[in-house]
């Protein structure tokens, strides 16, 4: 999300220009867009696409392995870092979702194997760690959307984190089911609608999108307005 990758162009100004960025397909596409917004269109850093169980060597002594986890954005990974001093496991942001919207599940097999090997230090995401129980699956949100769309008689306005592509896909699917057009309001959201389909992370039915300026041309019960603004998104 923006709170993780938004500072990369600023950091890149201060480090060696032969630095390599490793990330998932969507992550790298979003980072490239950040550089373009920053005014850097040439001499971009080398970006290498990784997937679950991809391994890279860092210097002589460090080996980093990417392990698939589920989160509120696609292409999220934990890092298994092997060093001469020990094994460090960095979870990254994660949410254990057994029925994810994109069907790309946590790589429990590899996590179990790494646990059996032994971990000397785990640095873990702690969001909601003080709350007992399990977080509901994202699919349950889709059910809630369908219930609300069924009841709605006027326009529907949905605020969403721009890079939460799973949630956006659920809104698209529900709008299509109820034969509503979608208007997008928010620069960061428009950018995601440009990027995510190009890397296979959004499936948008033909003719479902309309410009925000065209909303008045449709009846209220024919439109969904998708907007952003959370955490300062433009």
Q: Whereabouts are the PLM-identified features?
A:
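His/Asp/Glu-rich metal-coordinating catalytic cores
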Residues: 1-220, 230-234
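Short beta-strand segments
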Residues: 226-228
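Loop/turn-to-beta-strand initiation segments
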Residues: 222-224
């Amino acid at each position: 999300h923006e709170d993780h990758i938004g500072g990369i162009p600023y950091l890149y100004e201060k480090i060696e220009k032969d630095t390599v960025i490793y990330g998932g397909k969507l992550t790298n596409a979003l980072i490239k867009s950040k550089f373009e917004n920053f005014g850097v269109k040439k001499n971009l850093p080398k970006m290498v696409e990784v997937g679950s169980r991809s391994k890279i060597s860092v210097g002589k002594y460090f080996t980093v392995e990417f392990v698939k986890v589920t989160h509120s954005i696609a292409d999220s990974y934990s890092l298994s870092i092997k060093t001469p001093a020990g094994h460090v496991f960095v979870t990254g942001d994660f949410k254990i979702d057994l029925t994810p919207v994109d069907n790309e599940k946590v790589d429990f097999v590899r996590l179990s194997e790494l646990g059996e090997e032994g971990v000397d230090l785990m640095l873990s995401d702690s969001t909601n760690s003080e709350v007992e129980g399990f977080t509901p699956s994202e699919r349950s949100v889709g059910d809630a959307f369908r219930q609300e769309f069924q009841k709605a008689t006027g326009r529907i306005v949905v605020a969403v984190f721009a890079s939460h592509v799973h949630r956006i896909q659920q809104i698209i699917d529900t709008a299509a089911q109820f034969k509503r057009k979608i208007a997008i309001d928010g620069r960061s959201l428009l950018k995601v609608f440009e990027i995510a389909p190009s890397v296979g992370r959004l499936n948008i039915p033909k003719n479902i999108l309309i410009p925000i300026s065209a909303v008045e041309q449709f009846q209220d019960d024919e439109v969904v307005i998708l907007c952003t603004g959370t955490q300062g998104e433009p």
